[in-house]
Amino acid sequence: MALPRLTHLQFLVIAELSRGSARGRHLRGCLEEAGVRQSGPAFYQMMAGLEDAEYVSGWYEQQIVDGQIIRERHYKVLAGGKRAWRESRDFYLRVIGVPRPGLAYGA
């Protein structure tokens, strides 16, 4: 049984992105709600790794707030990220002895 390719933090991020694209700030908030304390640079370094692995795609969106141009990073999950997430989920389900979702017991 091969180990999962995703870390626990990457697993959480891809799970959130499976709901739809999101801003980096939103994803950091989700990690905080899960009890993860991570600096901004560490978060964006992790996201760059997910982009390099072609698990997520990132882009900047620009808006003007109080006369200032603000660029925010947005992300969406790619097919490779969904596959890596499912493989990680299935790994942990096997470890605890739970059948994979969608399969009949004993299949």
Write out the residue ranges for each language-model feature.
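Short, hydrophobic-biased segments on the C-terminal half of alpha helices
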Residues: 44-48
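Short coil/turn motifs at beta-sheet boundaries
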Residues: 6, 68-70
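Alpha-helical residues within the helix-turn-helix
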Residues: 29, 51-52
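Beta-hairpin "wing" of winged helix-turn-helix
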Residues: 53-68
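N-terminal helix-turn-helix DNA-binding core of bacterial DNA-binding proteins
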Residues: 2-42
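Amphipathic alpha-helical dimerization/coiled-coil segments
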Residues: 80-107
